[in-house]
Design a protein with these regions (language model features):
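Residues within the helices of the helix-turn-helix
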Residues: 23, 33-34, 52
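Pre-recognition alpha-helix immediately N-terminal to the DNA-recognition helix
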Residues: 19-23, 81
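Short, Lys/Arg-rich nucleic-acid/phosphate-binding segment
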Residues: 15, 64-72
Length: 86
């Protein structure tokens, strides 16, 4: 595992909700924030914050940025790679 991956993994694991949100994409092509909330039990407002955070770290991306609701999220290749370590 390279240094960048190790640092990112530590960052993800530092916040249990961040890790739960990322793990919710396992076996899913895409998810809406409300689906992530239902799968994880995390309040929708917190899910939105964590998705924004994961997006800033290039782990997820918005499939349909032109629409505010419902936003559809998908893992990036980097996000898929990180899932194998969680």
């Amino acid at each position: 595992m390279d240094d960048e991956t190790l640092i990112l993994l530590a960052y993800i694991r530092n916040a249990p909700t961040r890790e739960k949100v990322l793990k919710s994409f396992k076996d899913e092509d895409f998810l809406r924030p409300i689906q992530v909330s239902k799968k994880t039990g995390i309040h929708p407002n917190n899910v939105s914050k964590k998705l924004k955070d994961l997006r800033e770290h290039e782990l997820v991306y918005v499939i349909n940025p032109e629409y505010a609701i419902p936003r559809l999220y998908r893992l990036t290749e980097k996000g898929k790679n990180m899932l194998q370590f969680l």
